[in-house]
Structures are given as structure tokens and as C-alpha cells.
Amino acid sequence: MEIRRSTEEVEENHVMQITGSNGIVHNMEFMPQAYLRNQYSSEIDIDEEFVSTYPLEDAPLPIFLKFEDVEYKVRNSHASSANLVKTMVSKVVTHTNPDPDGYKHILKGITGSTGPGEILALMGPSGSGKTTLLKIMGGRLTDNVKGKLTYNDIPYSPSVKRRIGFVTQDDVLLPQLTVEETLAFAAFLRLPSSMSKEQKYAKIEMIIKELGLERCRRTRVGGGFVKGISGGERKRASIAYEILVDPSLLLLDEPTSGLDSTSATKLLHILQGVAKAGRTVITTIHQPSSRMFHMFDKLLLISEGHPAFYGKARESMEYFSSLRILPEIAMNPAEFLLDLATGQVSDISLPDELLAAKTAQPDSEEVLLKYLKQRYKTDLEPKEKEENHRNRKAPEHLQIAIQVKKDWTLSWWDQFLILSRRTFRERRRDYFDKLRLVQSLGVAVVLGLLWWKSKTDTEAHLRDQVGLMFYICIFWTSSSLFGAVYVFPFEKIYLVKERKAEMYRLSVYYVCSTLCDMVAHVLYPTFFMIIVYFMAEFNRNIPCFLFTVLTILLIAITSQGAGEFLGASVLSIKRAGMIASLVLMLFLLTGGYYVQHIPKFMQWLKYLSFMHYGFRLLLKVQYSADQLFECGSKGGCRTLQSSSSFDTINLNGGLQELWVLLAMAFGYRLCAYFCLRKKISICHL
């Protein structure tokens, strides 16, 4: 690496030109940060010294983020005037909003900037607006946002979106996959198709090594009720998941929450390496240790949505010292700043004017916060705005480059092949769960024993066998309905995250999900019917047996589609279960067994019930209208059609029920897809 002075003017401004291995000259400010913006610079690249672990050709496009006067507000929930408790709660929640416009203001004029090689920490007490600002920077909140945000002086756009990585506070990783599988599937879905398989695996290996994930690479990620890797390892896996695609801007929401001090410091060292590779890193942080605090390049302190400090982190204490606001005892700088942001003045010395104001006004917290906001407005904000307007202009080639959308899109079929493998691998433990197998086969054996060698020679025996038919319909309707209704509510957070990152088309996800789940909805009913059919001695006719099995499969698949539709329409585990129970009860009562003669004003319900059509089709497949029974009675033989069990059913035909079930199976899935599309588009993590 060659370093040389460029011009006298540059020398005066402490600017150096750095020549990398690619021979391009780069202007950079001569400061400790790996990347700093230079008002005289027209070309920027990455210093080899800071990317020793990341190949230069894989370095991300530098992004200079500037944000000015950012405001965000949300509409207040209108409590019912009839409910006194809700009205009181609403008033308490919205007391901070003096504007009578029906909105609560979360962010109130945030200004700042950051660039490649820097870690910007957003710090403040809980509820101050840190995460909200982070989501706005990541393009995840767009409604009711005011102010100006630019990326290399270009507003947010879909092309910018592809260059942003977002690590949520809760690690959103599929729990049943191993760390290596998680990264591998992400690589094959997100990396360009121009990269070979060997290159993708090499990149995975490099990231696993750099983030210290070698020991847990073949361990399940875990989460919830699934045992897996530790919290620190899971957080590093989340970061690896994002930097796999070389994001230019990496946003992290509380990455150290839940970690001990050592793990948190180690994680921040990793983020320093990520930043030195040419990325812009922004993280929210609640209360870092003093060691971690000094690892930040820039700091934005937020108090009740207002900025209280913005600048270099190491200069924050000097700034407040200039205001004569000092800790009276040895104190962690982060703890001191958080006390200021919340208005706490214990063990903090204040200037005389503040002490006088405190004496005159009993609310000392408000006095301090108001003072900090005023000083920020007069001392810091004008300088930052002037720098952004005059000197911090992104080079033209970076402005052009960021508007080029990264062509990472695989074909629909390629996405389907990759995602179907991942879906099956994630859910295969549920598909072949021992309890599920015992339940299905155990119930089949019990039913076979209860209806052992059942007959249709008398009305009573026929009624018993028809009851078995209806129970089979109930069993596989409920099993398939409840097996599918929770799929999308459970996977909502994973789907929202991956859709925000544009990993795949929603249609690919839905088709993979429904086809992979169909494995269980086909295998278990098939084995179930093989056991019950021959133990109960149904019609011993091969075509009849095959059509009976196919009918049960059609009922199960239609029930699966209905469950997916109900789950996608609410995306809530609790509400999905309640709605599914109600629908199952209605379909069960109108299925044609308990009530054959439904009142006319209620008959419309049975036409919505796939159990009604499935039960009728099952009877038509199993029995023939001219089949004889009661031959030993005084009146002689009768046809099955004359039985009271079939008063409302014509045992001939069956095509109508078949087509209706097929239409329902397809229609429910179509409705589920569009409901899922609408719901996911408005969901936020």
C-alpha cells in the first residue's frame, strides 16, 4: 500500500491519498477512523489495511448516510368515551404530545450523518425513539415521516434497499436449521447466480471463520422451545446472515441485549471489523460498558425524541463539560449520558443557571431536558447541517452506483428448488414426529377394533358403518385444519424479515410451504385408511378402496387449504385457533350426519362446508344405490338407497362433489395467498 500527499490544499486539511492494490487513488481524511468523508474527495475506496479478512473485490459499495430534521409521528388510539379506563390510559400515554392533531410525536428533528468505516451508536433510554429512527434509516417505516434522508445524496429507493442489512433485536432465524444450513440457504437465495457454488461455499466458510462460528456450525440455531446455540452465538449468526450479501449499510437493533459484558464486547469487536471492511454500521445501544462506549466512532444521544448530543463519541464528555455538566463521582460515560437523557441529576453537578431554574420549577427533569435541547439547537445542530450542505457531498460515481439495482434475482424455478429443500429440512421433524405417527396409527387401530369386520346387512349395522365414515371425515378435517392454521402465524416473523430483504418471491414461499406440508397430509391419511379399511371390512373392491383413499386425501388437502386461508387471514396464533374451532364446529354440524334435514334458512351453511361434500362423496364411493340389505327381514331385501341413512343423499354419481372439493382446495389456497400477500406487506418487525 502506497501513501502520498496529494496537494498543498489537501495537506492543510490533513487529507491523504491512498493507493490500493487495484491502483485507484483514494482521498481520505487523516483520522483514526478507517473511512471518513472528505469535502475535497471525488473518489473513495477501501484501505487494504482494514480489509485483510475481506477480499477487496468483494468489498461493498460505500454509503454515506445523511439525515436531517427527521420527524416521525403515530396516530393516537382513540379510546372509547364509554370506557373510562381506556380514556384515562389514552390521556396518560399521549400527555407528551401537546399538538391537538391526533398524533403522538416520536422523533422531533433528528440530524446527523455517518459513513463507511464508522460505527454510529444511537443511545437513549427506553422509548426515546432509537429503534424507530433505525427502522426509518432502513426504509422500514415510511408513513408519517418528515425530513430528509439520503444515501450517497440519493433518496431511499428499491436499489438502496438491496444494500441495507438489518439485524433485529430478536434473532429471527429458523430454529430447526443448523448455523451452516442457515447461511448456506441464505447464500444460495441471496447471492448472485453468477457466483459458482464453490464461490458461495467459500464465502460461507470465510464468514463462519471471521465471526467465530466454527464450534457451533453444525448445531441447531434453536429458539423458543428448541434447544440450540447460545445467545451470543445466535447474535453472531444473525450478523453473519446479513453480511453474507455484503450490505453497504448494516443496521443493528440492540445487538448486545441479553449478552454478558464479555460477549457484548466481543460482538462489538466483530462489528468494528465489519465496519473496517468498508461498511457503514449503525446500532442502537441501551447502556454499554465504558470499554464498549469508547469503541464507537459517533454517538447520537436521544431524549424523548429530541437529540441531546451528536458527534464523535469520545468528544461527548468534553461537550457536556463545556456546559459545566459533570459527574461528581467516577462514572461510566454511557451511564452518565443516559442519566442526562432521562433528566436524572443524582451525582451530577449542574451550572448555576440550571440550579436556579430548578429552584424556581419543581420538575427538575423537565428543566434539564429543556436546557439540553436548547443547547443542542444552538451549539451542535447548525454545525452539522452546514457540514452536510457544504462539504459532505458524495462523489458522483457513488451517486450513480447506488442507483443501480443489484441483480440478485434467481428464476422462479431456482428459488423454488432451494426454498423447497429448506422448508422440508426445517419442518421434517414435525412431519415425522413420533407422537404424530402414534396418534394417526393408534387411532386407526382403535377404530379398526371398534368396527371390527363391520357389516351392512341390517339398518343398525349400516348406521354404525356410516358413523365410522363420518368420524373419519371429522378426524382428518380437524387434523389437517389445525395442522395448517398455525403455519403462517408461527412463521410470520421469518417471512416478514426475508420478504423485507427480498430473498424470494412470496408465491415461491407459498407454493413450497403448501407442497411440503402436503407430504404429511398425504402419508398419514393413506396409512390410516389402509389399516381402518381392511379391519372394518369396507367394500372389498380395489377400485373402491383406491377411490376411498383418494377421497380422504382430497378432504385432508382441502382442509389444509382452509387452515392456510384462516391462518393467513389473521396471522395471529390465538385468533387463528379460535376461528378454526368455530369453522370446524359449523362444518361438523352441517356435514350431513348429525342433522340431515337442515331448516331452509340455514341450508346455505352446508354449501360452504367441504365436510358436507366430502362425506357425501365418501358414501357414494363406498356404497351403491342398488346394493341390497335387510334380506333376512320379513319385508325382504331392500336397496341401500331406501335406507333412512341416505334420505338426503343420492348414492349415484359423485362428480359434482369431486369438482366442488377440487375447486375448494384450489380456491382456499388462492385466497390464502392473497391474504398472506396483503398481511405481510403491512407487517413490520
UniProtKB/Swiss-Prot annotation:
Compartment list: Cell membrane; Endoplasmic reticulum membrane
Keyword Transmembrane: yes
Domain of life assignment: Eukaryota
Domain (ABC transporter) ranges: 65-329
Phenotype seen when the gene is deleted: Drastic decrease in seed production. Severely reduced fertility, with most siliques failing to produce seeds by self-fertilization and mature anthers failing to release pollen grains characterized by the absence of an exine wall on microspores, due to an impaired sporopollenin deposition. Aberrant structures in tapetal cells such as accumulation of numerous vesicles and granules probably containing polyketides precursors in tapetal cells. Abnormal pollen grains germinating in the anther before anthesis.
Binding site for ATP: 124-131
Tissue and organ expression note: Mostly expressed in flowers, especially in tapetum within anthers.
Stated name of the protein: ABC transporter G family member 26
